[in-house]
Amino acid sequence: MTTSRIDIFKQMLASDPANSAVLFGLAKEYEKTDATAEMIETLNRYLAAADDEGNAYGMLARAYEKLGQRNEARQAYERGIQAAASHGHPGMAEEYRSILSDYED
């Protein structure tokens, strides 16, 4: 029986539940398999443990959009703008601002 990458990441987290690199890797695996709810839960755990530079907030926002949760997506993009700007990623911050401009009603 082959062990999936998701199972491997889960095993790694069992010994170190706050390992931000493993949490991010697990979230990426959930993204690949369209496990959106699990991806959101894992990204929120990651963001609680890591000083993200903005990328995870964009992933989180897109996951919320996929579930039709625009308010949560907006909040994630806004936090992503702040993170990207504070870490010197103006292009990412501008991308998120552009997406949010489409949210204007």
Per-range role (PLM):
Residues 70-89, 101:
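TPR/TPR-like (Sel1-like) alpha-helical repeat modules
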Residues 11-14, 44-48, 82:
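Conserved structural position within tetratricopeptide repeats
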